[in-house]
Every structure is written in C-alpha cells, then in structure tokens.
Amino acid sequence: MSSRISQKMQEGVAAGVFPGGVLLVSSQGEVRFHQAFGSASLIPNQVPMTCDTLFDLASLTKPLATAAAILILIQNDLLALTDPLSKFFPEFTFGAKREITLYHLLNHSAGLPDWKPYYQEIAEQEEKDPGFLGSSAAKQKICQRVKEEPLIAYPGAKSLYSDLGFILLGEVVEAVATEPLHRFCYRNLFSKHDCKETFFIRLGRRPQAYRGRLFAATEECPWRGKVIRGWVHDDNAYAMGGVAGHAGLFSTAWEVYRLVRLWFDSIAGTGPLNSTLATLFTTCQKGNDIPVGSSWGLGWDTPSHPHSSSGRFFSPMSFGHLGFTGTSIWVDRKRDLIVILLTNRVHPSRDNSEIRLFRPELHDLIFEEVVGV
C-alpha cells in the first residue's frame, strides 16, 4: 500500500507528534494497511513499537465496551433508551436530574460536567488508609460524587462531552447485569468474538498471560511516581480500580478493528448486534430533545465538519471516537473504509496536542490513496 501513508506516520514520529503508533486501514472489507512505527516507550528504555502492542484505549472504552454493553442489554429487553436514570439511582429523582435518561447519557446531552478530579480525594485517603486506592470503596465513593454532581445544563439543552455520564452508564450495566462491567463485556463481547487481547486491567490483577507483553507507555505520572505502562492512564479510572465506563479498556489495533467491524456488519444486518440499534447508535441524533449543532450519536461521534478529526472527506454516514492517550477510530459506512490509529502521544507527557492537526491530515491522505478522492 501507499508509501505516502508510511511516510506520513514516520513524519509524525520524527516531529514528536507521538513516540510511536500502529495504523490499520481497511477498505471494502479487506485490511489494506497494518504497520507499526516509532517506539512503544522512550523512558526508562527505548522499545520499538510492534503491530501487536497493547494500547490503553482511553475513551474508546465508551463505544467499544460501555455503549456496546448498553445496546446488548437493550436488545435483550433488559433496558430501554427512554429509561430514566432515577430508575437505577435515587439521587436522580429530584429536580432536573429526574429528566435524565440513558439516551441523554449516551448522547452527551445530560447536562453533566465533562470531568472532575475525583481521584485526588482517593489519593489523599490512600495516604491515611493504604490499600484504599482502587478498592470497591474507592469506586463507590467516586460514583457517589458523580451522582451528587450538580448539573451545568438542563438535560437535552446542551451538548457537553462527559466522562461522568459514562461512569454512570458503567454503573447501570453492572446494576442490570448483576456482574462487573469487565466480566459482562468479556462474556458478551470479547470472548464471543475471539478478541482475546481486549480487556480491562484491575489494579494489582494483571492477567499472568499479559505480564510479558509489550504495552505502549503513557505518561510519566507525578502522583503515581512512575511511567505508566500496562495500567490505565486515566486518573479517575485508576482510582476506581481500573474498570470504569469511561476508560480502562486495553487492546491491539487488530482487535479494535475486529470490534469495529462487528458494528459495521451489524449495521448491514450480518452482525451480532441488532441492526436498527447499531444504526441508531452510529448516526448523528436530530430532534427536539437534541442540542443544536451536536455531532453525537449514542456512544459514537460523527464528523463535525468543517473541523472534524476525521478530515475533509469522511461522509455524513461516518462514525468514530477519540481517546485521550492518542487513539482514534473513524469509519465511513458509505465507502466501507475503517481507519484505526493507536498512538502513545501522552508519553512521556500529556503536554503535546500536535495530534489534533496530524489526525485530519492523515485521514485526508488515506482517502486520497485508498478511495481516490
């Protein structure tokens, strides 16, 4: 495949956009490009990136695990998009909060803040009570803080991307399925579809089989006192024990592709997810209860032209998502094009946003080389 695409990735490494990455491109159901570039880590030792490197997917957890789990529970008649959050949590039975539904959470229109540093309270408690960090009590404390959080907009009034909403969705999955989120996803998604290298890592419980595997390094974290590798980068997810609805999933580029293909095939009616629901989740939502200008589907984003990270050419029939660690998915259903970009752009520091310019340029180049625009 195009040497121009390889050159672009090599330029990204050389320019310091990211230490390394893995790019996978599929067109018309065929993987056309799958290549590793640069380094999986720079410190304490430089280690080359490989195609089977395991990445912290960050917010790709939202569509690939949490939204998929919600969809499965809906198609099994255990949930409905119109279910109010008050059905599961008494904290949402008062005021404007009683208007929040699962639909609002999936669509990032519930009116919840984007992020709060709950982990700081957990870290302080850890100093007094060693072992508290990552415990079930720590997770419960963070979830309670989320439930008590004041709304910053009326449900349905504004589009506000929110980790907090997906923390709550993870809790809904666990309440309805009566099992932890990681176990539900393993049983109903990952193991069923031969994704043996897609998993959450619970603090102190990394599976023996993965202890010798290559993980892409993320940040040199000041409060953890080390370079993070093989443990979740997201501070709140880490404080919650490594498993949360907004972050915590690890995988390879190949298995991310398999999970994305599962959505693609389901939309076409040939996959395991309900076709109508899969189409709904991956389509930009419109209507009276949807904020004007929102690009969100349900758990998935769609191109927000003219400044989408997908670039200039992905059609309105596209869906995708970004992850803070430097990961992204973009899928064009119209052209049967899938682009998986996994990088470690936060290594060794998150103070690097060059990928914001790099992503759309890369996607435009891929379109030129693969689709021929």
Language model feature labels by segment:
Residues 2-57, 78-80, 144, 234, ...:
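Short, conserved catalytic-motif segment at the N-terminal edge
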Residues 5, 57, 61, 66, ...:
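Hydrophobic (often cysteine-bearing) scaffold residues that line and stabilize catalytic clefts
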Residues 10-12, 54, 287, 314-319, ...:
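Short, P/G- and charge-enriched loop/turn segments at secondary-structure junctions
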Residues 11-24, 44-104, 153-164, 244-247:
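Short active-site loop at a secondary-structure junction
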Residues 19-21, 32, 180, 325-328:
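Short loop/turn microsegments at loop-to-beta-strand junctions
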Residues 96-316:
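Short, surface-exposed loop or secondary-structure junction motifs
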Residues 329, 336-345:
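Short, well-ordered beta-strand elements
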